[in-house]
Design a protein with these regions (language model features):
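Conserved, mostly hydrophobic/aromatic
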Residues: 54, 89, 134, 189, ...
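Metal-associated gating/positioning segment near the N- to mid-region
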Residues: 55-111
């Protein structure tokens, strides 16, 4: 027997390929079965109708770089902590995400990957965990940011083969292309279909291009913990990671558009250089998201101590940021206000672009017939009113901040 249909009518639907005024988006079970003008909606007396006049409906947001929220971090590696993060970020319109790890001893990273596997097999409530993003420990010491220096290291095949016990769960890895062993890992993992990203890197243009040849196709949190033009062989200059990403069409990238990490001109420069279709927005949120101002660790509970204050996560000396404390809806609003892009373009950077990056655009990332019933309903100011995940309506979710994990 088919599931009862649920029709959201009257909203402006941002697919994001089009904006459909006075739209109808119909869900049946966990699939979208109709998207179009309300006037074209077939009459069915059994369909439950929800009037969204004056509102917007868009695909659910997909966050490919997120560490935590509401006091929990994916490195805490428990089902309860995963659920806390996923429930919290569903409040911001995120319907699916990559659980992102941090630099730590190997057993702790493996524990997080084990929980990713468990949660994929038996999902928690809130945003769907699509897999894992390995960020660290294979980073540049000079560009490690808030990752603990005592655990930063070069790739060793004996170690990464243990990580590959979770090959099906790992969808993405960030590493510094210039460190010993990085290119070998890139060649191996890219052949397995894992997305390779350069990040936390002090690489030169020539080192970046060798990484592109080895399978790298993305750059993590543009401008952040990333090399720029320098004189590696004085007096001659050479571009760094920033210039390589801006110049090379084969590289995609991501922006932390929280209004804190990057000024508007750098956000606009990235899209002007790369084009909308090659840029995703990400939160890179840490456990302090949604929590009171105070001291919180980044990554594992023994990780780098950071201060959350006035909507920012900072290193204790306030010398740099330590991830963000925002949700995806904030990013989308900032793309419109700071980057001067359309609502449709902003939604694309949070939906279809990350879906294409993850090679799941056949089932996620847009409002189209046959795709997963993941939607976000927004008011006229683009604030989240309700999230729909796999056809289940989840209004603003309650959650218990896990303050003991500070």
């Amino acid at each position: 027997m088919n599931s009862p249909q649920l029709a959201f009518v009257g909203a402006t639907a941002i697919t994001p390929f089009d904006e459909i005024l006075d739209s109808a988006v119909v869900l049946e079970g966990n699939r979208i079965v109709f998207v179009g003008p309300r006037r074209s909606l077939p009459t069915d007396p059994t369909t439950r109708t929800v009037d969204l006049s004056g509102k917007f409906i868009a695909p659910g947001f997909i966050d490919i770089h997120i560490h935590g929220g509401a006091g929990s971090d994916f490195m805490d590696a428990t089902r309860a902590d995963f659920e806390t993060v996923c429930r919290y970020h569903a409040n911001g319109g995120t319907t699916s995400l990559l659980a992102t790890t941090a630099t730590a001893p190997l057993p702790e990273i493996l524990a997080a990957l084990r929980t990713v596997r468990e949660v994929q097999q038996n999902p928690v409530s809130g945003a769907q965990v699509l897999g894992a993003h390995i960020e660290g420990p294979y980073l540049s010491m000079a560009k490690r940011g808030c990752h603990l220096k005592e655990f930063v290291r070069n790739p060793q095949k004996a170690e990464w083969e243990q990580l590959l016990e979770f090959e099906k769960e790992i969808k993405h890895i960030t590493l510094a292309p210039e460190i010993p062993g990085a290119l070998e890992l890139m060649r191996d993992w890219s052949r397995r279909g894992i997305n390779i990203s350069g990040g936390h890197t002090d690489s030169t243009y020539s080192e970046m291009m060798r990484a592109v040849d080895a399978g790298m196709a993305h750059a993590t949190h543009m401008y952040c913990a990333m090399s720029t033009v320098a004189r590696p062989h004085p007096p001659h200059r050479e571009g760094g990671c920033v210039e390589t990403v801006l110049e090379r069409d084969e590289l995609t990238t991501e922006l932390i558009a929280d209004g804190r990490h990057l000024p508007a001109e750098l956000l606009r420069l990235t899209v002007r250089s790369k084009g909308i279709e090659r840029v995703c927005v990400v939160t890179d949120a840490m456990r302090g998201a949604g929590m009171p101002d105070g001291i919180y660790t980044f990554g594992p509970k023994h990780g780098q101590k950071t201060e959350v204050k006035n909507g920012e996560a900072l290193m204790l000396d306030h010398s740099s940021f330590a991830s963000s404390v925002v949700t995806m809806d904030v990013m989308v609003r900032n793309v419109v206000s700071l980057m001067r892009l359309s609502r449709r373009e902003a939604v694309a950077m949070a939906t279809i672009n990350p879906a294409r990056f993850l090679k799941i655009a056949d089932r996620k990332g847009s409002l189209e017939m046959g795709k997963d019933a993941d939607c976000v309903i927004l008011d006229e100011g683009f604030h989240v009113l309700e999230t729909v995940i796999a056809g289940v309506r989840v209004p603003k979710l309650s959650y218990e901040p896990r303050a003991t994990n500070r």
